[in-house]
């Protein structure tokens, strides 16, 4: 019985650990991201901005772009891969789907490493 209680207590802790590094689900404005582009900004901002994005692409991309905010200003869903920025070291890698014409922010500094067009397989993109 004691083991079951410990196991049940560990589930919320594990969930919170994953959620701390996940992108926020709230909507974000396009800022200065041109229509038809996927953009990532290196620093946090709110409302409009003239800050230059660290990544602006209209095609599939791989590399490393520092990011706090991202916006998909295209007509297609995107699969985005990112890693937790841990100083000079690379942290855990995550992948998420970004809806067309939507954006959000990371709750901690990240590096976006891959952007690909998502194949429409009928499953929703959150």
Model feature map: region roles:
Residues 1-39:
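N-terminal prepro-regions of secreted/extracellular proteins
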Residues 27-126:
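Post-signal peptide N-terminal regions of Sec-secreted extracellular proteins
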